[in-house]
Amino acid sequence: VMETKFEKLEKLISELNISESELAKWFNNRGKDKTGLIPTELPLVYRRGNELTVENGLNLSRKSELWGIQLLSGVMVALTCGSGNNVSETTWGKVKKFAEKMTFNGKPGVLPSKDVLKKHWGNKEEAKFAATVEVLEENEIEADGYRGCIWCSEVYYPDYAYYFSLKNGINDWNLKTDTGDDDRVALAFS
């Protein structure tokens, strides 16, 4: 009689006298490193109030605090495009205000510079971003891919500011009052 793989597993668990709680603990800790994090290619950003912290992986015990992904440049981008828990609408002014009220290691946030974003943008960052999003999705966390328009600190004219497109690596300018579904909240710390 052929045993199924599950029957074999049950037999082994019984032989080794492994309890259900030991098995559950082992199962839940697979793939984690000694810090209890599930490793990700790019660091993840966690938000508690107006304070941001960065960890080199997914901390399932802080899943509700998970805010975003840190790019190679150090710029932090929200998990998803659009408004939401960050800003009521994604105008330049509202995103700038949000950035300024957030802190990281005691420093206040600012809008990122288009030059900093451009310097690190490319296939390497995109591949790391995709791998990071994959880990998040495996753990039932919604995250958009390497896309979105990020408002930059540089102003073009009084009513216009630069934005950077993650999708194609270009920057352009737009009315500060414009919003779009592909706007992505992002901030930097100097």
Cite the ranges covered by each PLM segment.
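Short, compositionally biased
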Residues: 2-107, 159, 178-190
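An exposed tryptophan-centered "aromatic clamp" motif
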Residues: 93-109, 114-176, 188-190
